[in-house]
Swiss-Prot record:
Gene3D superfamilies: FAD/NAD(P)-binding domain
PANTHER family: THIOREDOXIN REDUCTASE 1-RELATED-RELATED (PTHR48105)
InterPro entries per record: FAD/NAD-bd_sf (IPR036188), FAD/NAD-binding_dom (IPR023753), Fd--NADP_Rdtase_type_2 (IPR022890), Ferredoxin-NADP_redctase_2 (IPR050097)
Subunit architecture: Homodimer.
Family to which the UniProt record says this protein belongs: Belongs to the ferredoxin--NADP reductase type 2 family.
Cofactor note (record): Binds 1 FAD per subunit.
GO molecular function terms attached to this record: ferredoxin-NADP+ reductase activity; flavin adenine dinucleotide binding; NADP binding
Catalyzed reactions per annotation: 2 reduced [2Fe-2S]-[ferredoxin] + NADP(+) + H(+) = 2 oxidized [2Fe-2S]-[ferredoxin] + NADPH
Protein name: Ferredoxin--NADP reductase
């Protein structure tokens, strides 16, 4: 089995395929396993994983790697899945770097697909000099005045994570309604984080490093300047499926349409996780785990015709799950 995407759903799928006795390879365009969690949210605390009241992103990925590595999957990192060819009883996936992988089944767990952060409207002149899109290491911002821009989960999560170590945290959003989970919004509102609504960043000042930020109140036009050594632009990401759009998959708003078995409609191609679309779809890491198991189990008879869809329980044979 080839799993395209080494994020949480892909890593759990690799474990589950190994548990089912399959040999597994994971292909990902990123240089490290863990997908968006490793690349963007390693310090973010995740609260909605079953059995884990709170876990940092990097800790979750470390645990998933330990679980998957019981069955020694092959990691093909820095390789973007590009071309698909069908052979008798198999498919061949060629990466953008020319690596060819033959597999009985492919499970796509590519998350957002190819993604790029949305820049601040003021530009990227201070990128790497105080302007960041995500916070891979919290302690870098110890004692700083931090401006977090955005109204979604990432903005509120980072504001909450930075509040205990930063000198000050200000969250600015151009509206007075937020996309973030209500419980997180309430926690930020109860903290020392200052929330400024109907506010945008008008200008970032500083020579070698950010020194101050000019904010504008969009309803009144009033401007004020406050000190800042860091600006976290949590404005979301633009994403597309890249070469996967050439695989004859059914696409709905940058997501791959699947049926209840996680099959895509293209022979021997399944999908799971945030990249999928079906009626009632909820995009959570937690649901991605179940979708990965569903995809692997339904794909199992294509790998081994004698295999059953239902695998039994891991507790029956002592295999960790």
């Amino acid at each position: 089995m080839l799993i395209v995407g080494a994020g949480p759903a892909g890593l759990y799928g690799a474990y589950y395929a190994g548990f089912r006795g399959m040999s597994v390879a994971l292909m990902d365009s990123l240089p490290e396993a863990g997908g968006q969690v490793t690349a963007m949210y390693p310090e973010k605390v995740i609260y909605d994983i079953a059995g884990l009241p709170a876990v940092r992103g990097r800790e979750l990925i470390d645990a998933l790697l330990i679980q998957a590595n019981q069955f020694s999957p092959t990691y093909l990192l820095g390789q973007q899945a590009a071309e698909l060819a069908h052979k008798p009883d198999a498919v061949v996936v060629t990466s953008s770097q020319g690596l060819r992988v033959r597999a009985k089944v492919v499970v796509i767990t590519g998350g957002l697909g190819t993604f790029a952060p949305r820049p601040l409207p003021t530009g990227t002149a201070h990128l790497g000099r105080g302007l960041v899109y995500f916070v891979p290491k919290l302690d870098v911002h110890t004692g700083q005045d931090v401006i977090v821009v955005g109204g979604g989960d990432s903005a509120f999560d980072w504001a909450l994570a930075l509040e205990p170590i930063a000198r000050s945290v200000t969250l600015v959003h151009r509206r007075d309604r937020f996309r973030a989970h209500m419980s997180t919004v309430e926690r930020v509102e109860a903290s020392s984080v200052e929330i400024l609504t109907f506010t945008e960043v008008a200008m970032v000042h500083g020579e070698e490093w950010i020194e101050k930020v000019e904010l504008v109140q969009t309803r009144t036009g009033d401007r004020h300047v406050r000190p800042a050594q860091a600006v976290v632009a949590a404005l979301g990401f633009t994403a597309d499926l890249g070469p996967l759009t050439r695989w004859n998959l059914t696409i709905d708003k940058r997501h791959i349409v699947v049926d209840p078995t996680m099959a895509t409609g293209v022979e021997r191609i399944f999908a799971a996780g945030d990249i999928t679309e079906y009626p009632g779809k909820v995009r959570l890491i937690a649901t991605g785990f179940g979708e990965a198991a569903t995809a692997v189990n339904n794909a199992a008879p294509l790998v081994d015709p004698s295999a059953k869809i239902f695998p039994g329980h891991s507790s029956d044979d002592g295999t960790g799950g």
